[in-house]
């Protein structure tokens, strides 16, 4: 299954969650496209709820089904709670951290910055969005890319960096201090439904 590249706004409204991270998709019409009001959303079956939750998280991170399942299976081999491990692995991806550092306004934008070679890890350019960061690694913007308007505007508008990261706005440099705890990640996702989906 290919990575979703269609209308993020329509998909956000259908799933009831902001996939861009800005929340703007749901401000005017917080209900699915094609509906005539907020009270006409279909009641889903148990399977439907599980599938919807999987799609929410997959589209949120903008990854295809194969990548998503690979990370899920890897999380299952780790010590601890499967779902929490899964969420932590997703949040430890390079593109996810670039977004959380405030170097990009949206997750899609963060992925593009990585793809186009603007981001460095420990001084070396990394252009793989799925690159899994380890505690202590330093994320920075390539010198030639530091004057990009897209980055400057994002940093200026950013006002919060999670506690598992540190960020120096003057240097455009951040550190992945530690693996995030579940309580520090999206409360809009019920990962247990995803565990149940893949356990069917």
UniProtKB/Swiss-Prot annotation:
It holds the Pfam family S4. The keyword tRNA-binding does not apply. SUPFAM superfamilies: Alpha-L RNA-binding motif (SSF55174). GO terms for molecular function: rRNA binding; structural constituent of ribosome. Part of the 30S ribosomal subunit. Contacts protein S5. The interaction surface between S4 and S5 is involved in control of translational fidelity. One of the primary rRNA binding proteins, it binds directly to 16S rRNA where it nucleates assembly of the body of the 30S subunit. This is Small ribosomal subunit protein uS4.
